[in-house]
Amino acid sequence: MQKILESINLDYAFMFTHKKVNSISMEGFEKFFADLPVDPYIKDKYRYRRLSRFILSGEEVIKQPHGYLFQSKSYNPVPNYGDIKREYAEIDDKLVALDNFQKMILAFCDSCKIHPEAEIGIHQIRTICSPNHSGNPAPEGIHRDGTDFIGIFAVNRHNIQGGATHLYTNRKEKPVFSKVLNPGDLLLVNDHEFLHFTTPIKPVVEEVGYRDVFVLTSPSLIY
């Protein structure tokens, strides 16, 4: 079982930051998104997903045992999402072994000053759209995840428009940050300070489009 550590210092002056991570190449990621299983908890089957949890020991990334994702309805009101244990297939070990995947975890942990014993959850997500159906990267609407820190690392945008990520201090106010995340972009967010949302995606031309991202959280919310 994961530890939610009281010693995590949230006085650290990190609120949110957006940066391009030039040291991480997208090469090698694409094939691992092509075979993602469908998210069984999303009604319209437009999302594909894997999930694993890790800890960082020094600069060694250590995969943790399989577990279940749990968020309360107060954070995730989507039917079949909140207040239930959700189980997803693990991220492929061959992907975990990639140098660029491990660099991504190190960049997240270093930037957010993640406690050495804190778990990191990594969600590998593809959201698809078609001429007849938009894809919704954030079916929860404007929300928090119920964790300390969130990282969104953009891997690919294929034949899509939309998909802008917004940050809010209040649901009733305009976003304080709004940007389409392009491949190699990393957005880091203090989940205690900001709500987040990503707008739906639609295809640019009349064929399937998709958005590929890794979402990193600490704590992992996996039990």
Descriptions of predicted regions:
Residues 1-78:
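N-terminal auxiliary "cap/dimerization" subdomain that precedes the catalytic jelly-roll/cupin core
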Residues 61-121:
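Signature of the catalytic double-stranded beta-helix
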Residues 53, 141, 150-152, 186-188, ...:
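Conserved hydrophobic/aromatic beta-strand scaffold that supports enzyme active sites
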Residues 163-223:
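Catalytic core of Fe(II)/2-oxoglutarate
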Residues 5-13, 79-91, 163:
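Glycine-rich, often proline-containing surface loops adjacent to acidic residues and nearby aromatics
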Residues 39-51, 110-124:
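Short glycine-rich, low-complexity/disordered patches
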Residues 114-182:
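Catalytic core of non-heme Fe(II) oxygenases with the double-stranded beta-helix
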